[in-house]
């Protein structure tokens, strides 16, 4: 009885104290924060890149680190390079099957699943890096991407970009479209389809396989990303002619896919952490490529004697015609590909009008003014 009276009295006194504090305009101390769930998750992030590879590999590492740190360790992401869990071209299937929770690659590697997936990576004469981000994030691209990947139990995010790529490495000069006939070139996606239209053989292979394929003669030409990555792979040791511009990948989007069941099982705040980490890397990687490509190009030319060449206009015109044919055929593909193609090309038409005045207009003017001053 005494104990019950004591508890009742204490409760009455506490209530009176709180009431008095409120009457005096004072607030009681806030209640203690609820205990954070002890649940800890560990995800595996597999990539299509060699371990520590600059730009692509280090970008994936940044995503893993950002998620781990931003989640306070509630979601720890461990990185695995190509070959550790799945080969470079096996990332999609491995994540879909649950062998890993995340994958870092490029969506045009999976065009065998759906031609629509090309549009989320690179399309010949397509969108620049900034335009691709605008279409995906604000032009309906993400919704189409979600629809396509959901069929395989996946969700994906833009998680990097290499910017405008170089046209490729060749063992001889490419003076006419006839010079493409008979060459064997590493080029994935719709760019590879275009090469086949002009008489070349196009192959898709992981980055770590390219140098050996050039040495062995399996291929005699290749493209990869740009000077920074191409220098790291050492292509200049086998081939000397380096062509621009890269018609096939004007802004190559890099993706971070996630197993949808694993993603949906996360609480809302951790889903946001994953999405934010990917969006941050989409900007960081592009800035890094823009910073490092210029210096690497100078090294290739001045130190290694690489011969820089521009594709002749008639070559580009022939490649553009072949690209139009390849893209036009997508109108007759499956419903998702057709809708993605239309969304992408409609956005491109609008983007061209603005880019001609904005980015292209400024860059042309800057070049003229700086030349006039020199």
Where are these regions (language model features)?
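N-terminal secretory/targeting leader peptides
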Residues: 2-132, 142, 147-374
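Core domains of carbohydrate- and sulfate-ester-processing enzymes
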Residues: 137-140
């Amino acid at each position: 009885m005494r104990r019950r009276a004591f508890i009742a009295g204490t409760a009455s006194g506490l209530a009176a104290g709180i009431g008095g504090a409120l009457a005096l305009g004072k607030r009681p101390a806030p209640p203690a924060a609820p205990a954070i769930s002890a649940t800890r998750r560990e995800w595996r992030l597999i990539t299509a890149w060699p371990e520590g590879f600059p730009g692509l590999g280090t970008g994936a590492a940044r995503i893993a680190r950002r998620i781990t740190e931003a989640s306070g360790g509630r979601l720890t992401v461990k990185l695995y390079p190509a070959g550790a869990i799945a080969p470079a071209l096996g990332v999609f299937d491995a994540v879909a099957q649950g062998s890993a929770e995340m994958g870092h690659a490029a969506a045009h590697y999976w065009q065998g699943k759906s031609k629509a997936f090309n549009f989320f990576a690179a399309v010949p004469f397509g969108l620049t890096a900034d335009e691709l981000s605008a279409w995906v994030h604000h032009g309906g691209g993400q919704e189409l991407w979600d629809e396509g990947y959901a069929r395989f139990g996946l969700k994906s995010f833009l998680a990097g970009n290499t910017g405008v790529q170089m046209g490729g490495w060749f063992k001889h000069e490419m003076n006419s479209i006839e010079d493409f006939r008979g060459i064997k070139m590493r080029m994935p996606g719709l760019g590879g389809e275009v090469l086949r239209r002009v008489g070349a053989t196009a192959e898709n292979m992981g980055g770590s396989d390219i140098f050996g394929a050039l040495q062995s003669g399996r291929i005699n030409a290749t493209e990869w990303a740009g000077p920074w990555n191409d220098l790291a792979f050492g292509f200049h040791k086998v081939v000397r002619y380096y062509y621009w511009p890269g018609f096939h990948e004007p802004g190559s989007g890099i993706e971070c896919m996630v197993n949808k069941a694993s993603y949906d099982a996360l609480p809302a705040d951790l889903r946001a952490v994953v999405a934010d980490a990917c969006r941050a890397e989409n900007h960081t990687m592009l800035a890094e490529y823009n910073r490092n490509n210029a210096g690497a190009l100078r090294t290739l030319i001045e130190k290694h004697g690489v011969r820089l060449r521009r594709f002749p206009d008639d070559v580009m015109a022939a490649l553009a015609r072949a690209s139009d044919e390849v893209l036009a055929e997508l109108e007759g593909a499956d419903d998702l590909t057709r809708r993605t193609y239309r969304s992408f090309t409609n956005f491109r038409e609008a983007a061209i009008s603005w880019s001609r005045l904005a980015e292209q207009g400024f860059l042309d003017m800057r070049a003229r003014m700086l030349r006039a001053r020199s």
